[in-house]
Amino acid sequence: MTFNKKNYEEISSFIKNNAQKPVKIVAVSKNHPLSSIIDALNCGIRIFGENRVQEARGKFQDLKSSHPDTELHLTGPLQTNKVKASLDIFDVFQTLDREKLVREFLKYQNITKRKKFFVQINIGKEKNKSGIMPEEGLEFVNYCINDCGIPVIGLMCIPPQHKTPSPFLLY
């Protein structure tokens, strides 16, 4: 796979001309080779998403040193036994979805408080997807912020594949 500069420029232009509020592009680089990530960096992309701790470490440990303005998001499910390792490489966690995971992050509070978190909501209520159910979302966000001091900055919601997304965007 290679980085598609033309596609990126078209998306950036569309956002610039149509967005009513600031929009940040997160380039999901999972399964992409390092050469594609370097091409993306050379085009100005600085926010990347990865769904595996080991793969992200292999690609970004050196890149983040040479490009300190790079921000790395965890976009896939996180096992509690990988929390400590993930804190070394990721800046933003988009998949906070259960109390056990929150408690594991709290073991490393000095590092956790410098990170950003999104609560993952399973808006399609799909059994095979991660995330908490929509009706539990507010209570879980309050637990994270008020009870645990986790810096939650938003929600990460993905509508089900092969369905019209608009009904799910009401959440």
Regions found by a protein language model. Name each.
Residues 1-171:
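Conserved alpha/beta-domain cores
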